[in-house]
C-alpha cells in the first residue's frame, strides 16, 4: 500500500480514545422495505376501531404540521406520532411494542458486503463502535434488527434521530452518538454514504475524521472510498 498519497491515521495509543460511529442504511445494511400497502396495514392495525381513511388523513395532517412547524431536521419519532394518534382515536398502544411490530413488518435488513469485517477490524483494535441513523424508530428497536443480521457483538450503541429529536447533519445528532460512546468528538471517526450527513457534517462538528462511501469517485487523499471494506486500510499501528 502506498501511503504517500493517502490519508492515514494512527490508532490512538490510549485505547479509551478510540471510537468509530457508522451510518446505518446503505453503509452497514441495505433495507428491503415492504410495499406501501404492508406499511399502511401494519399502522392501521394499531387503531382497529377507526376507519383506515380517517387514520391516513390524520397521519398526513400531523406529519405535515410537524414539518412546517419544526423544519426538516427535527425528527418526528414513531413514539410521538403514536402518542398523538392514540389521543385522537382513543387507543392505548404500547409505543415500544408497536414500533417493533411496525419495523419488523416493513423492514428486512441485509448486511452490506465488507461491513462485518470492517466492524470486526475496529473491534479487534479496541474501538467502541456506534451507529447513528436518521430514522423515526428508537435506537433500541433498530438495534434488535441489527442483532438479527449478526452485528450484536460488534456494536456498542445505536442512536437514532428518534432518540435525539434531530436528524443528521444537525450537531445534536453527532453529539448524541459521541456522548453515548463515552468519548470526546475529536476521538471519534464517522463513516457513511451521504456526503452532507456522513462526511461533511461530522468534519464540521469536529470529529477526528470521516469517510464517504461513494464508488463513483474514490479519492484516498480525501477519505472517499468505493467500499466500507476499504476503510481499515487508512489505519496503522505505528509509522
Set out the residue ranges of the language-model regions:
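N-terminal helical cap/lid subdomain that shapes the substrate entry/recognition surface
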Residues: 3-121, 125, 139, 238
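Asp-based, Mg2+/Mn2+-dependent phosphohydrolase catalytic module
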Residues: 1-22, 30-33, 47-53, 116, ...
Amino acid at each position: 500500500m502506498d501511503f504517500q498519497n493517502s490519508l492515514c491515521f494512527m490508532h490512538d495509543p490510549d485505547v479509551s480514545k478510540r471510537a468509530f460511529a457508522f451510518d446505518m442504511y446503505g453503509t452497514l445494511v441495505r433495507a428491503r422495505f415492504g410495499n406501501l400497502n404492508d406499511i399502511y396495514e401494519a399502522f392501521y392495525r394499531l387503531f382497529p376501531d377507526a376507519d383506515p381513511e380517517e387514520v391516513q388523513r390524520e397521519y398526513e395532517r400531523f406529519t405535515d404540521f410537524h414539518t412546517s412547524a419544526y423544519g426538516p431536521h427535527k425528527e418526528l419519532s414513531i413514539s410521538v406520532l403514536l402518542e398523538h394518534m392514540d389521543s385522537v382515536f382513543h387507543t392505548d398502544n404500547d409505543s415500544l411494542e408497536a414500533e417493533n411490530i411496525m419495523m419488523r413488518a416493513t423492514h428486512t435488513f441485509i448486511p452490506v458486503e465488507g461491513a462485518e469485517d470492517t466492524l470486526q477490524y475496529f473491534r479487534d483494535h479496541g474501538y467502541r463502535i456506534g451507529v447513528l441513523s436518521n430514522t423515526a424508530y428508537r435506537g433500541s428497536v433498530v438495534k434488535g434488527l441489527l442483532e438479527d443480521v449478526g452485528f450484536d457483538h460488534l456494536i456498542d450503541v445505536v442512536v437514532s434521530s428518534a432518540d435525539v429529536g434531530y436528524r443528521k447533519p444537525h450537531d445534536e445528532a453527532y453529539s448524541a452518538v459521541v456522548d453515548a460512546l463515552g468519548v470526546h468528538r475529536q476521538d471519534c471517526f464517522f463513516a457513511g454514504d451521504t456526503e452532507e450527513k456522513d462526511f461533511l457534517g461530522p468534519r464540521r462538528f469536529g470529529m477526528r475524521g470521516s469517510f464517504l462511501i461513494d464508488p463513483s469517485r474514490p479519492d484516498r487523499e480525501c477519505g472517499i472510498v468505493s467500499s466500507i471494506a476499504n476503510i481499515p486500510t487508512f489505519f496503522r499501528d505505528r509509522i
